[in-house]
Design a protein with these regions (language model features):
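Short, solvent-exposed coil/turn linker segments
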Residues: 1, 29-32, 61-64, 93, ...
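Short, flexible/disordered intra-domain loops and linkers
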Residues: 2-7, 136-139
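Conserved P-loop NTPase catalytic core
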Residues: 5-54, 147-161
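Short glycine-/polar-rich loops that comprise or flank the Walker A/P-loop
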Residues: 20-24, 86-88, 117-119
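Conserved P-loop
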Residues: 45-59, 66-69, 119, 126, ...
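Conserved helicase/translocase motor-coupling segment
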Residues: 55-116
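Terminal-proximal interaction/regulatory segments of ATP-powered molecular machines
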Residues: 89-161
């Protein structure tokens, strides 16, 4: 389980229960704006559309999604910024839902670097909005995954404009 072995859970629980004895719980009704959802990713492009966008953008890259994921496994995440440095557009073909959390988390770091550098992403295959499994979106890294989905939607919109 997430966090297992990192701290003394029994001690933590005892301290939290001790603190909670000094507080009252108040229910506040209304819209919870933290759960507004993720911006919807634009529809996936065709391989030909991605290739055309890459061809029209000098210095752009065109790669197969699985090949990118395999490459990320061989590069330390601290070096991902170098991978996208100076790249005006990333074209990805064959995008599909990821089932491995390791691969998904590496992709999250890459998306962060793309977003930090304002590198648009043109993608074919499945929608970028479906890249993470429902289980991933409910798990311990859900905030990272939702941030990544939001950023992917923004980068895909940039590629479409």
């Amino acid at each position: 389980a997430l966090g297992e072995g990192r701290f003394a859970a029994d001690d933590f629980l005892r301290e939290i229960q001790g603190l909670s004895a000094h507080f009252d719980v108040l229910r506040i009704d209304g819209v919870d704006y933290r759960h507004r959802g993720v911006p919807k990713a634009p529809p996936a492009l065709t391989d030909a559309q991605v290739a055309a966008r890459v061809a029209a953008t000098p210095g752009a890259t065109l790669d197969d999604f699985d090949a990118v994921c395999e490459h990320l496994a061989r590069v330390h995440p601290s070096k991902y910024a170098r991978l996208v440095e100076g790249v005006p557009l990333v074209g990805l073909t064959g995008v599909h839902q990821l089932t491995s959390q390791d691969v998904a988390l590496r992709l999250v770091v890459l998306v962060d670097r793309l977003y930090d550098n304002d590198v648009p992403v043109a993608a074919s295959g499945e929608s970028l909005g479906a890249i993470f499994t429902p289980e991933m979106l409910k798990g311990g890294y859900r905030k990272k995954y939702f941030r990544s989905l939001s950023r992917l939607a923004a980068l895909a919109e940039m590629a479409n404009s």
